């Protein structure tokens, strides 16, 4: 049993909860997710099973797309709807569509972001949420993130009321805290705010429409069709930069052979496939030998390499 399961993560569960439940359903210990989703967030959660856990780090590095809602008028301890109210300031003016779009444009591109106190980022060996639960606030490391697209989905021309909400879609780099983006939007508009709703609609090439629920997974297990829920390792990696090697090279890859970057691929890592369209290994640029590639992960053993 191996491959990638595209789970439609339900609300109220942590990513670790999802792993624990899937281990029980599939009776498989080797399971890992490819990027944490907060309990309040639903949507795409790719989960690696069996030998596919070797490729989890590469799927984690992909860009993510979310659709969500920002509410202006009050902020919370957790920056989302689950936290306690910290500050209240009613929206005492009309906010125009143009204003919101200008704020989203200002937050597009390469920006800096400070992770929220209620997050799993570690400071001095401790997770930030551990400090937060103890009532302590510590200095947090600022991180650089990339917002590829940030668009307003709400069609209204003006927003008014004591508390106002509007919907958005954002495509961003790994490590982006979307709830912090919601707070940043409020700051630029002059009001406390929080993220009132969020769903991840895509993680790299994986989209929400292709995800399945726990109930569907259990049904496939009961029907003896569990293999149908998996995306193969080869397919999961097929969209990444790729080299194809001959049989002679394929035999040597298991021993960690270096490869020439003949295609001059500039991406941080390169998948290496054989002529039967099997992914043999994942390579990266050699730090000391320009133009050469060295293996990061070898995905096949000796027996599997016999062609």
From Swiss-Prot:
This is tRNA pseudouridine synthase B. GO terms for biological process: mRNA pseudouridine synthesis; tRNA pseudouridine synthesis. The keyword tRNA processing applies. The lineage of its organism: Bacteria, Bacillati, Bacillota, Bacilli, Bacillales. It catalyses: uridine(55) in tRNA = pseudouridine(55) in tRNA. It comes from Bacillus cereus (strain ATCC 10987 / NRS 248). Keywords: Isomerase, tRNA processing. Pfam families: TruB_C_2 (PF16198), TruB_N (PF01509). InterPro entries: PsdUridine_synth_cat_dom_sf, PsdUridine_synth_N, tRNA_psdUridine_synth_TruB, TruB_C. Signal peptide: none annotated. It comes from the Bacteria. The active site is at residue 38. Responsible for synthesis of pseudouridine from uracil-55 in the psi GC loop of transfer RNAs. It is an enzyme of class 5 (isomerase). Its EC number is 5.4.99.25. One of its GO terms (molecular function) is tRNA pseudouridine(55) synthase activity. Belongs to the pseudouridine synthase TruB family. Type 1 subfamily.
């Amino acid at each position: 049993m191996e491959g990638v399961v595209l789970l439609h993560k339900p609300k109220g569960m942590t990513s670790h909860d999802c792993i624990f439940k899937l281990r029980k359903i599939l009776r498989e210990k080797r399971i890992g997710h490819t990027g944490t989703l907060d309990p309040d967030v639903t949507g795409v959660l790719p989960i690696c099973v069996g030998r596919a856990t070797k490729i989890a780090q590469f799927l984690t590095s992909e860009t993510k797309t979310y659709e969500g809602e920002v509410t202006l008028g009050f902020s919370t301890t957790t920056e989302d709807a689950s936290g306690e109210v910290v500050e209240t300031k009613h929206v005492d003016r009309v906010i125009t569509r143009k204003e919101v779009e200008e704020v989203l444009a200002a937050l597009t591109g390469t920006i800096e972001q400070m992770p929220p106190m209620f997050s799993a980022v570690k400071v001095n060996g401790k997770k930030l949420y551990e400090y937060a639960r103890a009532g302590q606030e510590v200095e947090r490391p600022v991180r650089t993130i990339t917002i590829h697209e940030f668009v307003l989905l709400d069609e209204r021309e003006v927003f008014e009321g004591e508390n106002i909400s509007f919907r958005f879609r954002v495509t961003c780099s790994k490590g982006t805290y979307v709830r912090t983006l919601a707070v940043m939007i409020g700051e630029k508009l002059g009001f406390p705010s929080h993220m009132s709703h969020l769903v991840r609609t895509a993680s790299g090439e994986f989209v929400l429409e292709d995800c399945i629920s726990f109930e569907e997974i259990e049904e496939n297990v009961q029907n003896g069709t569990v293999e149908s829920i998996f995306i193969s390792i080869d397919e999961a990696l097929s969209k990444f930069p790729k080299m194809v090697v001959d049989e002679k090279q394929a035999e040597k890859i298991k021993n960690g052979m270096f490869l020439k970057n003949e295609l001059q691929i500039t991406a941080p890592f390169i998948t290496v496939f054989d002529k039967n369209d099997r992914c043999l290994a994942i390579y990266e640029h050699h730090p000391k030998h320009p133009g050469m590639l060295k293996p990061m992960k070898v995905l096949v053993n000796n027996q599997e390499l016999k062609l």
